[in-house]
Design a protein with these regions (language model features):
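Non-transmembrane, aqueous-exposed alpha-helical and coiled segments at domain scale
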Residues: 1, 8-164
Length: 164
């Protein structure tokens, strides 16, 4: 598992909860705006998680059924929305209500061992014991995001958003 995927999942789930309350979000009725371009940093990863949870897709998404394109998901995901402050915006197509969501993963620092382990692990120079320890501290951070801080408003920051 991955801290970026874990944080993305929390951002989308909590953003949808802010928009829908106890109602069930409707796939294909949600626009997703990404602040950055698709190839910037982890934007593509975050957008992939948002697509899985909301159905919103870029130009490659489902084009809909029949001449009216019912259930269309295509073009509901946009990149490079410079007008937003958060990492992403979730917008209901039925009501126009929208929230911008930001992840502050810095409140959950990596284990101190990670500073020495990460370069070795990604370059292929880590020993088997170092690789095992790398996996352990990596997963500790994922657990902290998904379990210990799942409801932490400092981790997932949600604010109302308007395009005006």
């Amino acid at each position: 598992s991955c801290p970026t995927v874990a944080g993305s999942w929390l951002m989308v789930i909590r953003g949808l909860k802010a928009l829908y309350g106890d109602d069930i979000p409707e796939r294909g009725n949600i626009d997703v705006l990404m602040r950055d371009e698709r190839n910037a940093g982890t934007t593509g990863v975050i957008a992939s998680v948002a697509t899985l949870l909301t159905g919103a897709a870029a130009e490659t998404g489902f084009h809909g059924i029949g001449p009216a394109h019912r259930c269309k998901r295509q073009d509901l995901l946009q990149y490079g929305a410079a007008s937003i402050d958060g990492m992403l915006v979730l917008k209901r197509r039925d009501t126009g209500a929208a929230v911008q969501v930001e992840l502050n993963a810095g409140i959950i620092p990596f284990h101190p061992d990670m500073q020495a382990l990460l370069p070795k692990a990604v370059s292929g120079y880590a020993t088997p014991a170092e690789m095992q320890r790398f996996g352990e501290v990596w997963q500790e951070r994922v657990r902290a995001i998904l379990i210990d801080h799942a409801d932490d408003d400092e981790l997932v920051q949600i604010r109302p958003w308007s395009s005006a």
